Amino acid sequence: MNTMTTGLDALLITAPNDLQPIGEKILARQRITREEGIQLFEKGTLPYLGALANHVRESLHGHRTYFNRNFHIEPTNVCVFTCQFCSYSRLYAHRDEGWELTQRQMLDIVRSYDGKPVTEVHIVGGVHPKMNLEFFTELLQKIKAHRPGLHIKGFTAVELDYMFRKAKLTVEEGMKKLHAAGLDSMPGGGAEIFHPDVRNIICADKVDAEGWLKIHEAAHREGMHTNATMLYGHIETYAHRIDHMDRLRELQDRTGGFNTFIPLKFRNKDNDMSHVPESSIIEDMKLYAVARLYMDNFPHLKAYWPMLGRQNAQLSLSFGVNDLDGTIDDTTKIYSMAGSEEQTPSLSTAQLVTLIRQAGREPVERDTLYNEIRNYKDVDPDGTDLDGIPTDASLN
């Protein structure tokens, strides 16, 4: 038995009696139940949960921590929906307060990365009543014509549900159309919290849990991988969190199409839930740990560093997380407008490598599908190999 397992065994002995069998199941790689997941939230101490989650993380990935070189395009923040937690959107009647990018403007953004080693463009925005399925299929085709090798990850299930209904297409028909036009994968946004007791309060007018899951299942059946998210730290309970993760786990059992699970921290700046306090860093780390323990069929757990902040993202790497997203290059406003830690989110490759190394982990650049592009483990830390910047570059 290795030292890590021996240490975990010692920790199990000191855990509350009703948590010891759960820890033993996890070490034996057995699936935990809904009730056991709730118990971990309610009774698990941070050291206990962190040690178990880190054990699972290192069993899957060792010290490897992934990132990619990406940029975002947000076509618009004009939206037909009025989610209570959203600080980003503007109604169509007030579109003069927001932005609406044309196809030409979005292609100009893509062209601005010509010659740069980005591998992914992430396209997501508000649900604009005038930006329909044809508009976006044309955009996808033009991006692929300009840069065929660029992976396009685009559109939340909320956006797609609206597009498909307006086009009078089934989910399967709409997904085939987008895939043929150049869509390669989907992000996980719009999931929020699945349980209707919460969803009917915070985002009652957009696609429900069943619709969200149906769209992702259709994408998986079409041969595309997707991500999954959960918005946490507002009015939901531990039981609501486990219900959400359980529905995702069930779909993953059927399709295997999810790449990664991404918990998203609720931020209370400039929205209709500003009276709701934000979760503590202790609660954040507990959430990451339980997610890693419960989502046993998800290969990856991602912390979105602009939302958490750089130091907290480093900390999450000891609580089950093995992915920190990408360079982003200050191309997203969705979370900065809600008061995220990073108001101008951009890190060079060198800075991301440094951030990961400072946490005692091994930086690995990946593509969207987690194919390894480069392992930075053995790069000379005093060199100027990364973007022409020393690998110990300041994170400030």
Predicted stretch roles:
Residues 1-45, 114, 252-396:
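Auxiliary Fe-S-binding modules of radical SAM enzymes
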Residues 29, 53, 83, 123, ...:
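Conserved, mostly hydrophobic/aromatic
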Residues 37, 69-71, 90, 94, ...:
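Glycine-rich, proline-tolerant flexible connector loops at the mouths of alpha/beta enzymes
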Residues 48-92, 98-124, 186:
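N-terminal pre-triad scaffold of radical SAM enzymes
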Residues 65-73, 121, 152-156, 186-188, ...:
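Hydrophobic faces of well-ordered beta-strands that scaffold small-molecule active sites
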Residues 110, 136-141, 175-176, 213-216, ...:
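Generic structural signal for well-ordered alpha-helices
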Residues 117-216, 220-228, 234-235, 300:
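Conserved SAM/AdoMet-binding glycine-rich loop
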Residues 170-174, 235-249, 308-319:
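Catalytic cores of alpha/beta
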